Amino acid sequence: MGLGRELRRIGLEPVFSSFGEGREMLMREFPDAPVYGLPKIELFSEDGSFDLLLLLRRHPDLPLRFYAGVEADRRVIRRHGCKVVVSDCQFHALVAAQIIGVPAIVISNMLRVPGEGSLVRLINGMLRRMFELADIVLIPDTYDDTYDVPEIDTEVVWVGPILKRRPDELPPRDAVRRKYGIPDDATVVLVTAGGSKYGRRIVRIAVEGLKLLSKSIDVFPVIISEERVGDGLGLQLRYVDNLLELIKVSNVVITHGGHTTLSECACLRTPVVSVPLPNHPEQHMNAERVLQRGLGVAVPPEELSPKRIAEAIEQAIDWKVPKIRMMDGRGAERAARIVAGTLD
């Protein structure tokens, strides 16, 4: 969505295709833009693992769904005369671009799955093939030695995190606190872990940890969850349009290991407590980066408990997040310039 906003800012009119919650978010953010639906393909289970047998049971018509996705994107490209395709790892969009003969750009921070075994080799082979179908690979991060970049002929460009909005577009902290009814002098702990089964478990355990912590430290929890938890503890919201606002006014953010939220925290220099999903390779790599870059505390899933969360919050609450190169919230702007450059 941040890239879509920046493309509009420079006078381009993006056309979107997506499925599920992603499509709904795009329709809310861009009510006057074309947003097309795609066949839904769930590659990963709720705990973040990739299970080929589960995938085939869930989608016995997987080849047909993939073909339908290619055809849907091909029709959209032709209908609107799209000159470039930008995909966040949607393989069928790249195939559609190849068929029609327009440039393709992939945006991904997952370059290679760590580990051994035939399944890991299969996934890495698919990722490599996807990158080779593209003309440019944009990585929404800054380079460090936690990244294992595969040798591919495709141009790779590091652009920094792509945020929904630029940090300088956010309201002042006192205005955000007034908007949400957060006390001016409160020490804010934001809890947001997505809607998966394990994400909901993180939220519930975090709430119990906050109750333990409240016996020694005065904190104001802000909990983003569709489930009612906490028994009136702090502020609970089912959904927010602009999570960046709440990250800006928070002293600590408890979240899973998702790249987007961790990047938002890094750009706003808000310390995190990261709890990766048990079998999610990308999130475990992201948690490793949290430690290496000094962004906060990582709690391994096997250590997840109210006591461990309370300790992690106490450890992170006065954390000084360093300023990191390209972690400035302008990745969408850089990416938009590259996309526009393919049209010259």
UniProtKB/Swiss-Prot annotation:
Gene3D superfamilies: Glycogen Phosphorylase B (3.40.50.2000). Keywords: Glycosyltransferase, Transferase. Its EC number is 2.4.-.-. GO terms for molecular function: hexosyltransferase activity. The keyword Transferase applies. CDD domains: GT28_MurG. It is an enzyme of class 2 (transferase). Belongs to the glycosyltransferase 28 family. This is Uncharacterized glycosyltransferase MK0977. The lineage of its organism: Archaea, Methanobacteriati, Methanobacteriota, Methanomada group, Methanopyri.
